[in-house]
Amino acid sequence: KGGLKWLGQAGKMINTAEGTIDHYRDPNYTGKGITDVAERFATSITRIDHCVGDILQTIKDLKIDKNTIVIFSSDNGPHREAYIKGKRWSPSVFQSAGTFKGSKGSSYEGGLRVPTFAWGPSRIKSGKKSNSPSQFHDWMATFCDYAGVNAPARIDGVSLVPTLNRTGKQRKGIVYVEFNNQQGLYLDGYKGLRMKATGHAVDFEIFNTIDDGPESKNLAGTNEDFNRLQKRMKAEVLRIRMPNKHAKKSYDGELVPGLDISKKDLSNGVAVKTYLGEWDWVPEFTQMSAEASSLEKNINLKSLPAEKNAGLLFSGYIQIPEPGDWTFHCEASGSLIFKIHNKLVIDGDYKYDGTEISTTLKLDRGIHPYRLYYKTSAKKPSLSLQWEGSSVAKGLIPADALLVQGEQKR
């Protein structure tokens, strides 16, 4: 009873497949002394449960269950909106967040940490549980992995197949959130949380969310290890996030710190790996086997193995000589992705027309890791990466500013 049906009429998306519209309540929840909104809420959750069961049974009936993966999750914790004029609702009515603090819109676990069920009879063992934090962007990489295609280089996610299948080694992913003045990051098994990040000097609260789900014990400042972790968290959030003009933050003007690496451990050069293949997007070359690798003095196409159906991955470190605004300019015949630290700096992939793309970052003096991905097109290959600083004219990045790890031989 109840349900929905497609009418194809504007404004008629709320209807009923059977019975009187806006009327059905699951009999398990009527006459129990709860509010009308609570009856609606419980009915909706139960309907979802039944529908998921229907989907799984249909998959089995079609005999495709051995070749199917189903993921069921949520985008946030319990909400406080009633969605009915004049009615009120509290996320605590059915204790939907369990022992967690917070709700939808909060960066506490009650707002962020949602249950996820993975079902795949031929791959995923039932009854297993993982407390490893992951984020929505990991699912695209995961589905690409299951489908046997290379994930796009532009995404932040990592495949969760090793965790789901209990095989291989799980790569570390990025779990980072910011909303209004809230900021959260998972690092080294701990969660850093700033509920009022009015400036970058504000310290993170630090929680062990596995043993302390309610986030009741702030570990920040309790010993030198957590003092060091505090410093790393403050540096890492600047290396991950990109300012957004539509959601300005008080820490947008902070300089991105370089890595704590001695230049003595580096040498001049660019690490280059070559790939052959036909891809619909710039793939994540770091998760693929390279045809060959070499060391070049600068970024060029000398190592390109073919003019068509080929790709290059340039990587290493850029030595930034002075703090301030640094603009990077990319132009290519083909497609490209440019990252510094874990930031997507330039996206020249989908619908890229070959014109110059520029992005400005606030970088501190020091050593910053980069990756430049290039995929050939049907035209003659070409690629250019330039930089520009307050006292550095626009031009190709000089060879003495491009570094790689250790002593390298060309």
For the regions a language model picked out, list residue spans one by one:
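Active-site-proximal cap/lid insertion segments
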Residues: 1-134, 144-158, 196-201, 210-216, ...
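Short, solvent-exposed loop/turn segments at the edges of secondary structure
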Residues: 95, 109-113, 134, 155, ...
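Short Gly/Pro-enriched turn/cap motifs at secondary-structure boundaries
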Residues: 104-109, 174-177, 182-183, 195
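Acidic/polar loop patches that form or flank catalytic/metal-binding clefts of enzymes
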Residues: 125-131, 148-158, 169-175, 243-246, ...
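Zinc-coordinating Cys/His ligand positions in small cysteine/histidine-rich zinc-finger domains
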Residues: 136, 140, 398
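C-terminal accessory region downstream of the catalytic core in glycan-modifying enzymes
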Residues: 144, 149, 160-171, 186-257, ...
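Extracellular/secretory pathway-exposed regions associated with glycan biology
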Residues: 246-327, 331-410
